[in-house]
Amino acid sequence: MNQSQVPTLALTLGDVAGIGPEITARTLLDHDELRGLCRPVVVGDADALRRAVTGVLGRDAGVVRVVDRPADATNEPGTIEVVQDGPSLAHVPYGELSADAGDGAARFVMRACALARSGEVDGIVTAPLNKAAMHAGGHQWPGHTELLAHEFGVDNFSLVLSAGELYFFHLTTHVSLRDAITGVDAERTDNVLRLVGSFASALGRPDEAIGVAGLNPHAGENRLFGDEDADVLAPAVQRAQDAGINAVGPLPADALIPQAVKGKWKFVVVCYHDQGHAPFKAVYGDDGVNITVGLPVVRVSVDHGTAFDIAGTGAAREASLVLATRRAAELAPGWHQVWETAKAGSAS
C-alpha cells in the first residue's frame, strides 16, 4: 500500500519504569512488515527509548529520532521516530513505582489524544501504564480507558478484549466487585448493548448474535442466586431486541464463554473485569488485544501490564504490541463508520 494511504498511528510509550520502552523498540526495529500497514510514531520520551535500545537491545542509540510532529516522520525501516513529550525520564529506575513515570505515561496518552483530535494521527496504540504510578503522578483515572474517554469527551464506551474475530465487551471494568454489581444497571447495559450492535453493524455483521453473560451463577437460576439477571439484564436484552439488536441472554457465564472460545459467539458482553479478563487471558495470552469502542478514533492496547519484575532484563516479549499495532492499522481506515454508527445508536 502507498505510504500516503496507510494510517498514521501514535504509539504511546507507557510507563518507562516498565517494559513499554523495550517492547516498543523491538516492535519498530524488528517488525518492518508493520510499516506497510501504517506509519508508526512514538509519543513519549526519546531518552527512555534510547536507554532501552542501547542497554536492553544492544543497538545503536542513533536509531531513535525526534520529530516535531507526525507528518515529519519518514517511516524508514530500522528507525524509531518520536514526538517528544515533556522532560527526559531516563533517570527513572526500571522496576520501581515512580510518580515521574506515572505522570509521563498519562501525559503521553493525552498528547496522543490531542494529535488525534487535530487529525495528525488516525489511531492510538498504547503500551502499558501502572495505575498506582499514574495516581502518584497526579492523574486520578482508574486506567487508560477512562482517561481516553475523558480526553475525547465521551460517556458511552466499553473496554473490549479481542482475539481474532472474538470480542468481549465489558459492562464494568476497573472498580471493586461490590461496585461492579451496582454498576450493572439498566442505563449502562442499554448503552453497551447499543455499542455492541453499532460495532457489529460497522463490521458488516448487523445480525450477528450477541451473547450476554449473567452476573450471578447460572444467570441467577430463576432468582435463586440473585435478582440482577431477571431485573436488569433480561429487560435490557429485550429492549435491545426490540431495537433490532440480536442480543441473547442473560446466559450462564460458565457456558457462554467456553462456547465463545469454541466459535459459537463472536460478540460477548460480560458484567465485570475478571469475568472477561480471566478466561480471555487464560486462553489467548499474547494473542489478545484491548480495544476501546466508543471513541472517535481507534485505540488498541496490549493485553498485559508493565511487568516491573522483568523490566530492563530483555525478557519481555513484544508479541502483544505487534498485534495491537496490526489491529489498529486494520481497524483505523474504517473507524469513522464505527464512530458514526455508535453515535447514531447512542442517539436513538
Model-inferred region functions:
Residues 1-144, 187-271, 275-290, 295-300, ...:
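Contiguous, glycine/small-aliphatic-enriched amphipathic segments in soluble metabolic enzymes
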